[in-house]
Amino acid sequence: MFSEAKVTEIYCLADDFCKEFAKYQENHMLPTVHKSGKHRNKPNRMSDAEIMLIMILFHSGGYRCFKHFYLEYVCKHLAHLFPRRVSYNRFVELEKEVLFPMVIFIKTVLLETCTGISFVDSTLLRVCRNQRIHIHKTFEGLATRGKCSMGWFFGFKLHLIINDKGEILNFMFTSADVDDRQPLKQGSFLNNIKGKLCADK
């Protein structure tokens, strides 16, 4: 797990990014109108940067269950760093609101540098069991069927490039039916990759 100084450093990076991203959004997006026709500008109790930081800490900390991580680690051991924390259920609702800015934040701020030896591979992101494909609504029209070494699945693929230290250099999400070699044909996926790039067949 990160030291408190590292947590503060990541928060500062995320907060600076969120402020710039909010300015960009303000200039390029239409205002959100509530169903009643009124504009809603009620801010969340937690900032987007705090939500993003907690999500980054979870994925970096080796925890398997987010609920346990949030209730037992964030709410007890990091309570002094998150004085405006919300309930677990509310946090889960807020997570999806910061997904898009978080992906951009990771892509623009947190990616590491290439050392000359890189590895590329993909992993499946299953959204439901195969028996539930026909009643699945959340990713309807986005998720597709795909096949991997473990058989058929329904969802997406995550393509990752890492260096020899295990640090992430780039990533890309695709539908499940995309061939693993397809992202390598896109120049933007291989930006800043130099030297040897190893992959399985």
What do the PLM-derived regions correspond to, one by one?
Residues 1-201:
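Short alpha-helical elements
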